[in-house]
């Protein structure tokens, strides 16, 4: 029996394009079915800034209302790197950008309060979905940002408490 050999792995461009096209089809179906009754947000987070920008371009063409961009996963960027990542994304789209902090899905990476405060001054970054499950962190985002910046809960169990403390709403998984 031959042992597997190590070698470079090339991403399959056709499969990636197919996946992007399928995402766009899903967004279009959701937009069609909701008939503008509710805003439609597209989750466009990816490993690279370039990939997020490409997905945002597709989301913009389809006509979604905003994009939600999770922090990059599998890597541990610094706050400066995350700042440049999110600013490049926000600068490259006309769509409102919602930051998405979900440490449980990104190897423990949490957007710091200082970083969110700094990013909240960008005219195209309109809010953050906080799925940390840490109400203290959510409250820190609320206290550190202006009233027009939407801090949204991502944990169902914290919606009520978050709203009491000033969160603007929730984007739930259920």
Residue spans for each PLM region:
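Active-site beta->alpha loop and helix N-cap motifs at the rims of alpha/beta catalytic domains
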Residues: 1-108
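Catalytic alpha/beta core domains of metabolic enzymes, predominantly
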Residues: 91-92, 104-174
